[in-house]
UniProtKB/Swiss-Prot annotation:
Source species, domain of life: Viruses
Source taxonomy: Viruses, Adnaviria, Zilligvirae, Taleaviricota, Tokiviricetes
Signal peptide: none
Gene3D superfamilies linked to this entry: 3.90.320.10
Residues spanning the membrane: none
Protein name: Uncharacterized protein ORF223
Pfam entry (one): PDDEXK_1
Amino acid sequence: MQEGNSFTELLKNIIAETFKELSKPVDKLQYLTVTQISQCPRRSWYELKKGGLDLASEYADMGMVFHSLLEDAVKNRQELGKCYTEVDIAKPFYGIEIRGRIDTLCISRDAYRIIEFKTTNMQDGFKGIETAHLRQVSLYWYLTGSQPMRKEIYLVYIDRKTGEVKVINMRHESILKKRELGNRIKYLVRSFNENKVPKPEPGRSCIFCPYKTVCKAWKRSRY
C-alpha cells in the first residue's frame, strides 16, 4: 500500500484536524446536546470542560453497528410510512440551543413517529426504561413541536447477544414535564458557567464512562 502521496497526507490531516477540533474543551457554552442533558450531568461537565472523544469504546462501536443495521432495516419499508434516519434537530429551549439527532423518523398520512434504538442486556429480563433514555425521548417530543398528524414516540430495546426486541410505545403521560427538563438544563448551564462540578448520577452507564477514574462515583454504583 502506498502512503506517501499528497492526497493521502491531505486526507490524513483533514480527518486529524476534525477530531482534534471535536475534542477541544468548550470555552463558552453556545449549545447543549440532547445526550448531554440526558446523561449524568457530571459526565457532560467533564466532556465540556475537559474535552475528548470516547471513540475507542467497544461498547460504543457495538451500538453504532446496531443502529446502522436497524436504521437500514426500517427506512425502506413502505408500510411504516416515509422513514428518515439520523435526523438532525436544533431548537432554542429554556434559553439555550439544544441539538439532537433522532435515530429514525417515520411519517405517514395520520402519524408522525419518532423512533429511538437502544442496545441492552435482557439476559435476566428487561430492566425497564433507563432514565437517561426517558429524558432523551421527552426532549425530542418537545423539540419536534406540534404536528398536523398524531405524534408518537417509540423506544426500541435490542438485546446485544440474542437479538431479542422490546418495543415500547411511549404514552403521552410518560413524557417528562417541560419544567423538569428545563431545571436540568439550567443546572448544567449554571455548573458550567460557575465552573463547579455537578453531582453525579451513578448507574449502569458508569461502567463505560471515560471519566470514571477521575469521578469515582462508579464505586458507589450498585451495577
